[in-house]
Swiss-Prot record:
Protein name per Swiss-Prot or TrEMBL: Large ribosomal subunit protein bL27
Entry's Gene Ontology BP terms: translation
Cited PROSITE patterns: RIBOSOMAL_L27 (PS00831)
Family recorded in the similarity comment: Belongs to the bacterial ribosomal protein bL27 family.
Region (Disordered): 1-24
Gene Ontology molecular functions: structural constituent of ribosome
GO cellular component terms, semicolon-separated: cytosolic large ribosomal subunit
NCBIfam families given in the database record: L27
Originating species: Prochlorococcus marinus (strain MIT 9301)
InterPro entries named among the record's database cross-references: Ribosomal_bL27 (IPR001684), Ribosomal_bL27_CS (IPR018261)
Sorted UniProt keywords: Ribonucleoprotein, Ribosomal protein
């Protein structure tokens, strides 16, 4: 007979790597063309003037300039739009 109870196994103990999402260039910051402005899942931020959207919804600068954010009201949900002011 065993004098110690055997240890059981657990179904926990895993975690995914962080995806480093979020704003990479804030309002008033100067950026160059091609700079990543926001990494996101879905469209929390919408692309505005001189801003492009990648296939993974990443927003990036199309031209050199200064980052500006604006709030827009759309379908009872406040959204934010990101622009590059030249």
């Amino acid at each position: 007979m065993a004098h110690k109870k055997g240890t059981g196994s657990t179904r926990n103990g895993r975690d995914s790597n962080s995806k480093r999402l979020g704003v990479k260039a804030y309002g008033g910051e100067k950026v160059t063309a091609g700079s990543i402005l926001i990494r996101q899942r879905g469209t929390s931020f919408l692309p505005g003037i001189n801003v492009g959207k990648g296939k993974d919804d990443t927003l990036f600068a199309l031209k050199e300039g200064t980052v500006s954010f604006e709030s827009i009201k759309r379908n009872l949900r406040n959204r934010k739009r990101v622009n590059i002011v030249i």
